[in-house]
Swiss-Prot record:
Organism, scientific name: Chlorobium chlorochromatii (strain CaD3)
GO cellular component: plasma membrane; proton-transporting ATP synthase complex
Subcellular location: Cell inner membrane
GO molecular function: proton-transporting ATP synthase activity, rotational mechanism
Transmembrane intervals: none
Protein family according to the UniProt entry: Belongs to the ATPase delta chain family.
Name of the gene this protein is made from: atpH
Membrane topology summary: Peripheral membrane protein
Annotated signal sequence range: none
Superkingdom in the source lineage: Bacteria
Record-given protein name: ATP synthase subunit delta
PANTHER family: ATP SYNTHASE DELTA CHAIN
Amino acid sequence: MSVVIASRRYANALLSVVEESNTIDKTLDEMNAISEVLHHSRDLVHALKSPLISYDKKIHIVEEVFKGRVSETVMFFLKLVGKKNRLGHLPHIVDEFKNLLDEDRGIINVDITSAVELSDEQANELVATIANMSGKQVRATLTVNEELIAGAAVKIADTIIDGTVRHQLSKLRSSLVAA
């Protein structure tokens, strides 16, 4: 089973449990804390992925690292994931949990890359346009890449809308070479 499919199943199971117990926001905070710890500790991620470290040792590590940081429900979930030998997928499971929660709440994540820094007015207008087109709430990440020359590229899930001069020049070059 692929990492994405397995991670989504585990995340979906956790989301179902916390929806029933009405602890979604608390669990989201805990998953963000787990994500933060994993992001800052490569050694922990490698240990959780390692086939050389036993299940018992991995569970001990998880208990020591996350004790007091997560609820009993999340700790039980982490132990279950460990028992199924999937702790190496934990970063993906956390990401999938957040993605599923965003889907349920009608939130889309959008990456906007522009050649110059957008003013607040420009950024707000672009975000509002995307929200109107999608009918969803937009969580935007803005970045600047001067190599784009001018314009902007917008990435929504698997779709990229590229309105950059660099992209237009690339298309022009391709058509001239083909001619």
